[in-house]
From Swiss-Prot:
NCBIfam families: thiE. Its EC number is 2.5.1.3. Condenses 4-methyl-5-(beta-hydroxyethyl)thiazole monophosphate (THZ-P) and 2-methyl-4-amino-5-hydroxymethyl pyrimidine pyrophosphate (HMP-PP) to form thiamine monophosphate (TMP). One of its GO terms (cellular component) is cytoplasm. 2-[(2R,5Z)-2-carboxy-4-methylthiazol-5(2H)-ylidene]ethyl phosphate binds at residues 148-150, 179, 199-200. This is Thiamine-phosphate synthase. 4-amino-2-methyl-5-(diphosphooxymethyl)pyrimidine binds at residues 52-56, 83, 122, 151. Binds 1 Mg(2+) ion per subunit.
Amino acid sequence: MNQKNSNPKNPPRKISLLKQIDFYLVTDSGLSKKGTLSDVREAVDAGCKIVQYREKNKSTKEMIDEASEIKRICGDRAIFLVNDRIDVALAVDADGVHIGQDDMPIEIAKKLLGPEKIIGLTVHNVEEALEAERNGADYVGLGSIFDTSTKKDAGKGIGPASIKEVKNAIKIPVVAIGGINRENCIPVVENGADSFVAISAVVCSDDVKRETRKFIEIIREIKNSGRQ
């Protein structure tokens, strides 16, 4: 049985939000000017519907404390995912996790978290995207679309045309990641991305709310104009 059938068991509100996502916030305390909690608050206030807590420099206790506050900020307004750390996601009852190709297999993550939780998987090509969908991923993060310095092991950018190839191959949402900013985000959406991540462009700015809102406006304008 295709594990995608487990998707309808997810909370209706969260699955509804997953289908409506536009800009996708990934936190980075190392790059942030104002701090992770401030970034999340401003992005969600601007209309961001999905937040991934990505933290590599804090203790487990510190992460749980911070994740608990992020969950409170997101509330009913945004999906709250934890990057990699299933233990932290379980501790705070996050809406799900985002994992990579070398992390825990989706099937095991589903067993630990339960079928109602959302799982996103990083993929780099059509083959990995198809496998992710077969194994029950709720969405894929495709990249790196452009060269990026945010993630050291991201490799060379695969280009926005790769988004269309993956989008045509699977039915679950495709989130574009890697090196995306306001100068290059338009072809990302035009090639079919449901959403995209722009870490540096947002958390390094002086006004996270303004930058988030601008990205949301760009995405919605392209989608509403039929340019996808």
